[in-house]
């Protein structure tokens, strides 16, 4: 055992971790998801994440005698949305049960959940190598059930005065618990499933999808070579999930190698190792009984098809669309858009507006990803889609395509609009005139060519050392000359025009 402890004190073992084919990894996960409802699950208290402790608590939330629960239909609807999206079998009749245990954060003395008759069963989520970064071409993760339940209060242990404080704002918040089959065969599949699930609940506006804030909380069940499974509770980040699984798998493999018995238990993750919390409870310990104060949920036979018709395109369908014609986006950009609904809608509007008038979707892609979003990054401000409506950005892109403004001038104008609130909503053509950024339109082609020749000739004569490097084969040095020419003309003449003229004058 000493060698095991020494092994786990090293921080490098995590990066070198690898599953041993002689010791089969098997894993299932349970995901608790806070629903984005206006009110709590069984009371009219508003849901609140950042309010003053115990300021959003009804009589029922804190367990006062005589208070009764009333189901929030919005929570039911969100649970059904997720169940349909995951191809679950919706149960026409489901009910609530009481899970009894005593703890400060559970004032009722029991949790209302769906132990016997959950809202949905037998779904699945398909992973694939193209979008989910798994080794297999595809992997189907089966979902055992989805159930609705209430959250507990939040307990805080104050080390300074050794007090225990309970905030009941979270008590009775609506949750759905999703339980998978033990179908995960490696850590990549677990990571891919969690990320895909986060994207889905955000996309469907069911939950914020954040692990770090506790909106999603994950328990994992791990076993090796068919030995008793070990549960690890309340993993709060993707890195915690991966590290806890690596540690626990290695711990169990070491136990098997040393002929030590693996017991069925619940363990916690400290950040560096798993520690035993308690032996795994049998279901009878919780004394589940039907909740007599809540009626059965009776659903229409057509509820699944009705909800399916109301669902938006799911994230994987959008990824498939964005990475195919006519959009042809790189996967990393398609994934970014899929995870940001407002930005996705903006992109679709821009693409259609540009493609309809210019027949080039590539132009829209480049300007949206690299120029528009890049401009916000360049000046280190948060992206604000309202600053420049999609049809206005399309106008700017088309002005560049039609050579009414140079690319350099368009970039300058884009930065100006972002940094100048009073320019918001002004037509692009008016702004081009206002800032005198248009291409020279009062010059004939011959006069423009003569002017460009004069500028390029002067730059060549003033930069003999750069010209010498170009003639010796350092072709990229011509960009320096082009930059000087663009600066001289304040970006009004296209860089391509100067490039062609320099090549002509230098006989390249």
Curated annotation (Swiss-Prot):
Listed GO biological process terms: glutaminyl-tRNAGln biosynthesis via transamidation; mitochondrial translation
GO function terms (MF aspect): ATP binding; glutaminyl-tRNA synthase (glutamine-hydrolyzing) activity
Record's keyword annotation contains Ligase: yes
Assigned keywords, A-Z: ATP-binding, Ligase, Mitochondrion, Nucleotide-binding, Protein biosynthesis
Compartments, record wording: Mitochondrion
Signal peptide boundaries: none
One GO cellular component term: mitochondrion
EC number: 6.3.5.-
Misc: This protein may be expected to contain an N-terminal transit peptide but none has been predicted.
Function: Allows the formation of correctly charged Gln-tRNA(Gln) through the transamidation of misacylated Glu-tRNA(Gln) in the mitochondria. The reaction takes place in the presence of glutamine and ATP through an activated gamma-phospho-Glu-tRNA(Gln).
Subunit organization: Subunit of the heterotrimeric GatFAB amidotransferase (AdT) complex, composed of A, B and F subunits.
Stated family: Belongs to the GatB/GatE family. GatB subfamily.
Name of the protein described by the UniProt record: Glutamyl-tRNA(Gln) amidotransferase subunit B, mitochondrial
Native source organism of the sequence: Scheffersomyces stipitis (strain ATCC 58785 / CBS 6054 / NBRC 10063 / NRRL Y-11545)
Taxonomic placement: Eukaryota, Fungi, Dikarya, Ascomycota, Saccharomycotina
